Amino acid sequence: MLPLKRISGQLLYLPVYSNVPYQIDTVMFDMSAFVAIHNTNLSSPIYLTKVLYFNKDGKIVDDFLESGNIRVNPLATNFFYVPYEDKSGTGANFLIEWVADSLVNEPLVESVTLNVKPNNTVAVLSQGKVIRERY
């Protein structure tokens, strides 16, 4: 078994799908998205310093941390929601940055994008991709 990687921060890219093509690009299927940041540490908090939401064209739609950083306690989860009515597109994404005061386990960062309708439910699970790390 490989040893756990211990780091003090990351910048992550996380795709979400607020609209997906349905019927060969003629109709868009609207979806909502839940983004979850799970602190996998047993004793150390992490701090979310950036949670930016971009549309398919790379333009910022929302800054979820306008009021300041968020502390995520050990084994706790913080989540963000993109409503069903959002029209940011199939290529929408988040940039998420977190830091810690010491070397810690990396968090689990995921999005669940879904549309639940009778006889036509769609759900997509995505995980964050590391862009930059801090040791």
Over which residues does each language-model region extend?
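Short, hydrophobic/aromatic beta-strand segments
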Residues: 44-51, 62-64, 106-110
